[in-house]
């Protein structure tokens, strides 16, 4: 077994990372190894200067600073693993400065734009339209990550009764780091999912038993709709709803969910829990977003001459 395979196996066993995180590590490592091979370098004998050259190479290929930093972090972790396994004694990434980047505020849709998108989707009564309507309603009602949305299982749908005896739908979601959280969804999302469940069988491929367990089954290898396919369908729906598809993505719906909750007075800690953020500082970016919107609103004040 090669060093990379050993490292990925360790990540899977000890850090409980998601499949997507493991794939990201794998891509970064193979890209790095391809660079080393191209420049006739050995991973066990490279210098810090070699690493700086590699970073310059990444930047020259128009890779954003955030992406470069992620790759550096991957390689640094990889060398820490190699040292722990006595394959090398030196981490060439240790004294490398990370490229600086601006922490951009997330893009969001207005409530009016969200309503326009949802109204358009609810008018399509084809099986594909009913499914997409359910997925978009659920995404905006929950703030799920797209990877969490598409991989939901039927068993993740739970029901529970309120103190008034009302039955409501909740979802048990396994997020990053295998951390479980519970999501309660609104009535519109419940209705759209109930409608979808009546036609879900259209998408079940009985020849592939694996897809039977998923809420949004498909013929894809994983057994459920891919993130990429959902993103394409979402952009198409946005176009027909009169919105610019360039500014629509599953992640923007997640940002919109969080921002609109904060705007409505929700506590930041509650939003952190709903989004599945491990650190409150990740959630705090939405407070900066709200401040930004307030500044723009004040600029429109009639007595503001600037």
Curated annotation (Swiss-Prot):
Annotated localization: Cytoplasm
Family annotation (Gene3D superfamilies): 1.10.150.130, Intergrase catalytic core
Residues forming the catalytic site: 145, 176, 251, 254, 277, 286 (o-(3'-phospho-dna)-tyrosine intermediate)
Coiled-coil region list: none
Span of domain Tyr recombinase: 104-299
GO-annotated molecular function: DNA binding; tyrosine-based site-specific recombinase activity
Entry keyword annotation includes DNA-binding: yes
InterPro entries according to UniProt: CB (IPR044068), DNA_brk_join_enz (IPR011010), Integrase-like_cat_sf (IPR013762), Integrase_catalytic (IPR002104), Integrase_recombinase_N (IPR010998), Integrase_SAM-like_N (IPR004107), Recomb_XerD (IPR011932), Tyrosine_recombinase_XerC/XerD (IPR023009)
Domain Core-binding (CB): 1-83
Pfam hit, one: Phage_integrase
Keywords: Cell cycle, Cell division, Chromosome partition, Cytoplasm, DNA integration, DNA recombination, DNA-binding
Statement: the UniProt record of this protein carries the keyword Ubl conjugation: no
Entry GO terms, CC: cytoplasm
UniProt GO BP: cell division; chromosome segregation; DNA transposition
Main location: cytoplasm
UniProt-listed NCBIfam families: PRK00283.1 (NF001399)
Function in brief: Site-specific tyrosine recombinase, which acts by catalyzing the cutting and rejoining of the recombining DNA molecules. The XerC-XerD complex is essential to convert dimers of the bacterial chromosome into monomers to permit their segregation at cell division. It also contributes to the segregational stability of plasmids.
Assembly and oligomerization: Forms a cyclic heterotetrameric complex composed of two molecules of XerC and two molecules of XerD.
Similarity comment: Belongs to the 'phage' integrase family. XerD subfamily.
Name of the protein in question: Tyrosine recombinase XerD
High-level lineage: Bacteria, Pseudomonadati, Pseudomonadota, Alphaproteobacteria, Rickettsiales
């Amino acid at each position: 077994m090669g060093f990379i395979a050993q490292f990925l196996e360790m990540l899977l066993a000890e850090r409980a990372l998601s499949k997507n995180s493991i794939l990201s590590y794998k891509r970064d490592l193979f890209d790095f190894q391809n660079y080393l091979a191209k420049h006739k370098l050995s991973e066990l004998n490279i210098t810090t200067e070699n690493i700086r050259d590699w970073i310059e190479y990444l930047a020259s290929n128009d890779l954003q600073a955030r992406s470069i930093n992620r790759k550096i972090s991957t390689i640094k972790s990889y060398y820490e693993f190699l040292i722990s396994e006595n394959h090398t004694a030196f981490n060439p990434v240790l004294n490398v400065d990370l490229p600086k980047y601006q922490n951009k505020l997330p893009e969001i849709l207005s409530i009016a734009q969200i309503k326009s998108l949802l109204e358009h989707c609810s008018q399509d009564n084809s099986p594909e339209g009913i499914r997409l309507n359910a997925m978009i309603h659920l995404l905006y009602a929950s703030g799920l990550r797209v990877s969490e949305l598409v991989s939901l299982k039927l068993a993740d749908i739970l029901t529970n009764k309120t103190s008034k005896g009302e039955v409501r739908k909740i979802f048990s979601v396994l997020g990053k780091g295998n951390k479980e959280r519970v999501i309660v969804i609104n009535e519109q999302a419940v209705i759209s999912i109930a409608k979808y469940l009546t036609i879900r069988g259209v998408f079940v491929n009985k020849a592939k038993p694996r897809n039977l367990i998923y809420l949004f089954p498909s013929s894809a290898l994983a057994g459920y709709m891919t993130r990429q396919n959902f993103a394409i369908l979402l952009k198409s729906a946005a176009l027909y709803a009169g919105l610019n598809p360039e500014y629509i993505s599953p992640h923007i719906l997640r940002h919109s969910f969080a921002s609109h909750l904060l705007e409505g007075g929700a506590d930041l800690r509650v939003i952190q829990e709903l989004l599945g953020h491990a650190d409150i500082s990740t959630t705090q970016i939405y407070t900066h977003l709200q401040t930004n919107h307030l500044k723009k609103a004040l600029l429109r004040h009639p007595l503001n001459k600037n």
